[in-house]
């Protein structure tokens, strides 16, 4: 079954679920249906399970072993100044390109998603009071990137994205 939610709504739900998971690792099961009521008009459940998707994205992020400390601190500093969007996108794009240059078999879109998740996780650990301000810009960054959107939709949607 397809979800009745739009791609944008699904992305928002996934980013918020990841954020909750990173801020409260012991509450992962409790946040399973954080913002995602998933029944289609027929009343049947859909295949969009935010907990599974967030778990796959976490595994994907765990594959990224690049240096995040300086980049994360820069994003945090800009977030405090209210300038999250541009620096977040520049940081994710730069780290993704660097990682792809080191591993020619890695698709840029996978690297982009992995770096995004890992950066969110790292920021949640070192600046939990600020990381919540990154969720909306990160959602917008993913939704607004045509290549990432096409990659996810080419997989059959978020629910078919593999780690």
Swiss-Prot record:
<dbReference type="InterPro" id="IPR036834">
    <property type="entry name" value="Bcl-2-like_sf"/>
</dbReference>
<dbReference type="InterPro" id="IPR033543">
    <property type="entry name" value="BCL2L15"/>
</dbReference>
<dbReference type="GO" id="GO:0006915">
    <property type="term" value="P:apoptotic process"/>
</dbReference>
<dbReference type="GO" id="GO:0042981">
    <property type="term" value="P:regulation of apoptotic process"/>
</dbReference>
<protein>
    <recommendedName>
        <fullName>Bcl-2-like protein 15</fullName>
    </recommendedName>
</protein>
<keyword id="KW-0053">Apoptosis</keyword>
<dbReference type="GO" id="GO:0005634">
    <property type="term" value="C:nucleus"/>
</dbReference>
<dbReference type="GO" id="GO:0005829">
    <property type="term" value="C:cytosol"/>
</dbReference>
């Amino acid at each position: 079954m397809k979800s009745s939610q739009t791609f944008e709504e699904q992305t928002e739900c996934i980013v918020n679920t990841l954020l909750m998971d990173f801020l409260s690792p012991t509450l992962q099961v409790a946040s399973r249906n954080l913002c995602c009521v998933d029944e289609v008009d027929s009343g049947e459940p859909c295949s969009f399970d935010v907990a599974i998707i967030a778990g796959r994205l976490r595994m994907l992020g765990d594959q990224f072993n690049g240096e995040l400390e300086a980049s994360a601190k820069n994003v945090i500093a800009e977030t405090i100044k209210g300038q999250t969007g541009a620096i977040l996108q520049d940081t994710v794009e730069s780290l993704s390109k660097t990682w792809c240059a080191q591993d020619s078999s890695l698709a840029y879109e996978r690297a982009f998603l992995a770096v995004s998740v890992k950066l969110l996780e790292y920021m949640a650990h070192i600046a939990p009071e600020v990381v919540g301000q990154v969720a909306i810009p990160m959602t917008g960054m993913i939704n607004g990137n045509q290549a990432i959107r096409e990659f996810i939709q080419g997989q059959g949607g978020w629910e078919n994205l593999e780690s």
